């Protein structure tokens, strides 16, 4: 099975975001309060009332991308990492989300981008049982011999955007963020999933 090169204009997606206001103020319902005497001291205090009041304020419900990355043709997991404990949980998560994963049918020479890690930041406190992580670094483009049996996650699938946000090393809400990809990450090391940027067709096994 061949995956043809994309012909459309390259798509860019965000990896960093800032929250944006809606512009004009809107009325937000908040719980009203009433003044009542403190049962212990007798002093006046505020207590929740059984009603709501509309308060004009700006609402922050949208996000704006502050840094973009081009969507690659897909992502490559080299054969030595296929079946390894290091990426087992990541592959499980991708499959649980319904993201299509294919297998290279033969050895191929491809242009890929590898991400070299320059900085790792972890949240000082756990959130939902995880130490949220962020990576900083740079991509370099190389020609690579991809072994048959390596895995390919194509970007020409309905869940491409989801795949991007989960896989990209600098994503602010991906597999790195939630420590799903954690083992082996260190400054000076290469992120284990590569971006495929080659214009040539890719040969994968038919399902």
Residue ranges and their predicted role:
Residues 69, 79, 83-85, 91-96, ...:
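Catalytic centers of hydrolytic enzymes
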Residues 1-112, 116:
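Hard-cation-handling environments
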């Amino acid at each position: 099975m061949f995956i043809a090169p994309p012909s459309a204009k390259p798509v860019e997606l965000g990896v960093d975001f800032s929250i944006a206001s809606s512009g004009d103020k809107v009325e937000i319902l908040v719980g009203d309060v009433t003044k009542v005497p403190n049962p212990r001291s007798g002093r006046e205090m505020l207590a929740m009332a059984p009603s709501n009041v509309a308060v004009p304020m700006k609402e922050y419900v949208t996000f704006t991308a502050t840094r973009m990355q081009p969507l690659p043709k897909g992502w490559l997991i080299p054969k030595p990492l296929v079946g390894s404990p290091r990426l087992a949980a990541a592959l499980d998560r991708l499959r649980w989300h319904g993201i299509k994963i294919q297998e290279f049918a033969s050895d191929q020479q491809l242009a890929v981008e590898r991400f070299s890690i320059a900085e790792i930041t972890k949240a000082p406190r756990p959130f939902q049982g995880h130490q949220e992580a962020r990576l900083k670094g740079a991509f370099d483009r190389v020609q690579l011999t991809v072994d048959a049996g390596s895995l390919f996650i194509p970007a020409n699938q309905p869940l491409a955007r989801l795949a991007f946000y989960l896989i990209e090393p600098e994503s602010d809400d991906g597999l790195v963020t939630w420590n799903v990809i954690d083992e082996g990450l260190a400054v000076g090391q290469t992120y284990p999933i590569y971006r495929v940027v080659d214009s040539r067709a890719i040969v994968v096994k038919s399902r």
